[in-house]
Structure formats: structure tokens, C-alpha cells
């Protein structure tokens, strides 16, 4: 990809001396692309003393573990994967998401569309391909589900509403949930976990960390089902519409919220050889998705013309 000079506005972060620690191993391009006003360790901190919306975030994950199981995911597949709810352009969809704030995110209070611009602009400045910049912009667009979802399905569109089937860290359903998930104390509330423990008691050979009999070893993540939300919806939407993205882009869309996999090293026994290649791209994307989160608003008017040329 050839990066051209332009007059687009960009972020100029002025890091504190404390925040500079931990960034020393990043390249110059990377340092220009992340929010250095916070230390790396200050992102994704799920503690009441550091998170203004801690109770909302905590309740989100409690609900997510309680209600997100294999049967729920299958029901959402049937309900939403006909893709017949509406027809709109990307920019019309963004307008619908204009006031949507993710209730599961401890790092940012801005509407999701603004985070999309933050991510895309950071990827552009780092010199990554056009397709990755575009994925950065739309990676959370699946949250448009709130227009058709029900509160009982965890699909409210308000910042303090029930969003447990729209956003948040995902995991593979139908098998025990890893203890490396955020708020692991809620894992025992999950129907899949309850079922797995019952099987373990009956057979005495299935414990946490085993993937049980639902998935074969090295079956590939494309054959697994994940906790339902914006990732899965957008992934299936792109496939349904035969969008011309490379496999790496589709993997980013589907797996970017699965922190147990791309950050904590879980599910390695389910991965195919190709998944190891895709993992590197998801991890690369995650740096821009996570470390650009900042309540400094991007200039979307200035950035939009460039995005439209991608």
C-alpha cells in the first residue's frame, strides 16, 4: 500500500512520563497510533476505583455469563441471520449508531462510531492496508442489532441498558468457560458450565480446560460458536453479502472480542493451522482497537473523505 500525505487531522498524544513506561518496545509508527496518555496497564482495568461505570460493566458481564449459552446463540442465529431487517448504506448505519455507547467498556464513554474512526485513523497512520483501515472503521458496526433486538435478548441501545448480547468479551460456547475471562466469578452462572460440571461429576474425566466432546481437536475456530454479539452478526452479514474482504479481515471481525483466545492463550487445542496465521492479524488489530480508546473526539468530518476513498 502507498501512503500519501494528506491534510487529515490526526491525534497528537502528549504522554506523561509514567505513561511512557511500557511503550518502549513499540515502533515509531506504533507510538504515533496509540493513546499514550494512559499506560498500557491502565486499559481494561475492571476495578471500581478506576472505572466510573464499574457497576454497569460488572452487571453486563454477570448477565452475559448467565444467559449466553449454546442454546441462546443458536436462537440468535435463527432470529437474525436472514438479514432481512432493513436496507441501508454504511453511513446510514453509522447515523443509527450515533449515540450508541458500549456498556461493557471501561475505557471510553464516546459513541461507538467515534471509536471506529479512532481505530481506522490509527491503522492508517501505521501504514496498514486499506482493507484493514476499513475494518477498523466498521468492526463494531454489528451493534446495529439494537434496532431489532429486545431487552430480554440483551440488546438495548442505551449506555446503561442491557447490552449483554451486543458487546463485551466473547468465548466459545458449549464448553467450559476459561477462568482467564474477565469477571471469572460469574462463570458458574453459565448453563454451559453447569452442564459441563454435571458431565464431569458423572464421568470424572471432564474438567475445566478440556473442550469436551462438542468440538474435535484442531477442528478450527471457524467450526466453533462464540457468545453472540456484534462480532458474529457483522461476520455473518459480510459473508451473506459476499463482501470482498480477505480472510484476515473476516477473522478480525469475528474474533476481535475473544480476549480469552487472542490475549490469554485459550482454545489452542481447537485451532487449525490457518488459525495460527489469523491470530497474528487479530492481535495486530487489537493494539489499535484497544490502545486508541480515548475520550478525545475524532474529527469525523475531516476523516470521512479519506475513508470514502478506501
Language-model region placement:
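Non-catalytic interface/linker regions that flank or bridge core catalytic/transmembrane domains
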Residues: 1-88, 92, 99
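Sparse, context-dependent recognition of short Cys/His-centered cofactor- or disulfide-binding micro-motifs
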Residues: 39, 46, 65, 82, ...
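Generic secondary-structure transition motif, activating predominantly at the C-termini of alpha-helices
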Residues: 58-61, 65-68, 80-84, 98-101, ...
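Active-site flanking loop/helix segments enriched in acidic
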Residues: 77-114, 214-221
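Divalent metal-dependent catalytic cores for phosphoryl transfer on phosphate-bearing substrates
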Residues: 108-302
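Ser/Thr/Pro-rich, acidic low-complexity intrinsically disordered regulatory segments
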Residues: 302-310
Amino acid at each position: 500500500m502507498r501512503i500519501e500525505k494528506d491534510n487529515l487531522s490526526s491525534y497528537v498524544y502528549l504522554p506523561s512520563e509514567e505513561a511512557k513506561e511500557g511503550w518502549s518496545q513499540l515502533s515509531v509508527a506504533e507510538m504515533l497510533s496509540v493513546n499514550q496518555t494512559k499506560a498500557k496497564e491502565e486499559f481494561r482495568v475492571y476495578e471500581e476505583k478506576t472505572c466510573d461505570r464499574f457497576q454497569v460493566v460488572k452487571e453486563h458481564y454477570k448477565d452475559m455469563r448467565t444467559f449466553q449459552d449454546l442454546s441462546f446463540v443458536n436462537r440468535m442465529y435463527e432470529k437474525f441471520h436472514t438479514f432481512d431487517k432493513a436496507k441501508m448504506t454504511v453511513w446510514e448505519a453509522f447515523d443509527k449508531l450515533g449515540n450508541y455507547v458500549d456498556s461493557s467498556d471501561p475505557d471510553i464513554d464516546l459513541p461507538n462510531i467515534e471509536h471506529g474512526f479512532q481505530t481506522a485513523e490509527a491503522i492508517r497512520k501505521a501504514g496498514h492496508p486499506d482493507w484493514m483501515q476499513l475494518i477498523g472503521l466498521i468492526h463494531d458496526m454489528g451493534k446495529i442489532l439494537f434496532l431489532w433486538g429486545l431487552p430480554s435478548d440483551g440488546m438495548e441501545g442505551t449506555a446503561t441498558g442491557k447490552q449483554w448480547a451486543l458487546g463485551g468479551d466473547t468465548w466459545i460456547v458449549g464448553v467450559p468457560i476459561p477462568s482467564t475471562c474477565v469477571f471469572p466469578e460469574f462463570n458458574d452462572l453459565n448453563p454451559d458450565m453447569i452442564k459441563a460440571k454435571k458431565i464431569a461429576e458423572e464421568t470424572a474425566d471432564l474438567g475445566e480446560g478440556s473442550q469436551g466432546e462438542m468440538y474435535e481437536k484442531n477442528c478450527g475456530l471457524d467450526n466453533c460458536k462464540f457468545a453472540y454479539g456484534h462480532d458474529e452478526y457483522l461476520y455473518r452479514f459480510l459473508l451473506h453479502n459476499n463482501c470482498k474482504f480477505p480472510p484476515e479481515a473476516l477473522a478480525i471481525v469475528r474474533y476481535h472480542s475473544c480476549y480469552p483466545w487472542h490475549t490469554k492463550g485459550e482454545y489452542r487445542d481447537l485451532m487449525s493451522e490457518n488459525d495460527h496465521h489469523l491470530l497474528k492479524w487479530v492481535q495486530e488489530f487489537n493494539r489499535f482497537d484497544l490502545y486508541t480508546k480515548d475520550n478525545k473526539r475524532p474529527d469525523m468530518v475531516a476523516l470521512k473523505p479519506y475513508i470514502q476513498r478506501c
